[in-house]
Amino acid sequence: MKDIATPNRTKDIVEKYGFSFKKSLGQNFLIDTNVLNRIVDHAEIGSESGAIEIGPGIGALTEQLAKRAKKVVAFEIDQRLLPILDETLAPYGNVTVINKDVLKADVHEVFNEQFEEGQDVMVVANLPYYITTPILFKLLEEKLPVRGFVVMMQKEVGDRLAAKPGTKEYGSLSIAIQYYTEVETVMTVPRTVFVPQPNVDSAIIRLLKRPKPVVEVTDETFFFEVVRASFAQRRKTLMNNLSNNLNGFPKDKELLDRILTEVGIDPKRRGETLSIEEFATLSNALVLHKLS
């Protein structure tokens, strides 16, 4: 049997079931087995590993994962795809498809039911563009015990995740993801290897979870509030952004100026120039004056 991820096999499956693509679900099926293998290679899936997939579509990536992993669990929100997946994944007895929205599912419960304690598990997915960021944050913030993520996403979002200080892509998203993970751009993927073709190119991004966050902060919630406030208006200085947008901090520009100067950060700098370490230092100084 031919791999699912070929133009002809994908076309045959779609026509057989009369499947119509839903733009609202970001459905773009990958038709290049080489790209799928690059994804699975970088996930370093072994014969004892587990994999969580989100949005399996007709099972193209699922199939490649099932060939290598001990167990694959795939979340699929679209009920119309279930009979297709029943057929395409029939040769593989190590796949469980769960018809749930991963953003609403109790992922810890599923994880504990489907995987062995201490098993090496990766999230491997061709993520729908419109929910890439919410999915990553849900799984990171809920501290799902996975080794990391290898995910296909819109190239523009991938660039933001991997961005360095001082670049136009760098922002609160870069800091939030890099706080929890080491980010690596594996490859850019042209839009031509999808059916239907999206309007943008994609990238494969690998995120390996850090044993502990990259910086130590006194108050994690406040740290992210400082970061978000610093990027509220990109063209404004830190002084302006923090004095206008940092909730829970006194509206006292003199105090703010003094704290910034004490930690060695020029109040006239913009948020995009600060490293994650500088944000941690700043947050740890500001939190001492937070309104209770």
Swiss-Prot record:
It is found in: Cytoplasm. Its main location: cytoplasm. S-adenosyl-L-methionine binds at residues 28, 30, 55, 76, 101, 126. Its EC number is 2.1.1.182. InterPro entries: KsgA/Erm, rRNA_Ade_diMease-like_C, rRNA_Ade_Mease_Trfase_CS, rRNA_Ade_methylase_Trfase_N, rRNA_adenine_dimethylase, SAM-dependent_MTases_sf. GO terms for molecular function: 16S rRNA (adenine(1518)-N(6)/adenine(1519)-N(6))-dimethyltransferase activity; RNA binding; rRNA (adenine-N6,N6-)-dimethyltransferase activity. GO terms for biological process: rRNA methylation. GO terms for cellular component: cytosol. It comes from the Bacteria. It catalyses: adenosine(1518)/adenosine(1519) in 16S rRNA + 4 S-adenosyl-L-methionine = N(6)-dimethyladenosine(1518)/N(6)-dimethyladenosine(1519) in 16S rRNA + 4 S-adenosyl-L-homocysteine + 4 H(+). Keywords: Cytoplasm, Methyltransferase, RNA-binding, rRNA processing, S-adenosyl-L-methionine, Transferase. Specifically dimethylates two adjacent adenosines (A1518 and A1519) in the loop of a conserved hairpin near the 3'-end of 16S rRNA in the 30S particle. May play a critical role in biogenesis of 30S subunits. PANTHER family: DIMETHYLADENOSINE TRANSFERASE, DIMETHYLADENOSINE TRANSFERASE-RELATED. Belongs to the class I-like SAM-binding methyltransferase superfamily. rRNA adenine N(6)-methyltransferase family. RsmA subfamily. This is Ribosomal RNA small subunit methyltransferase A. It comes from Bacillus cereus (strain ATCC 14579 / DSM 31 / CCUG 7414 / JCM 2152 / NBRC 15305 / NCIMB 9373 / NCTC 2599 / NRRL B-3711). The lineage of its organism: Bacteria, Bacillati, Bacillota, Bacilli, Bacillales. The gene is rsmA.
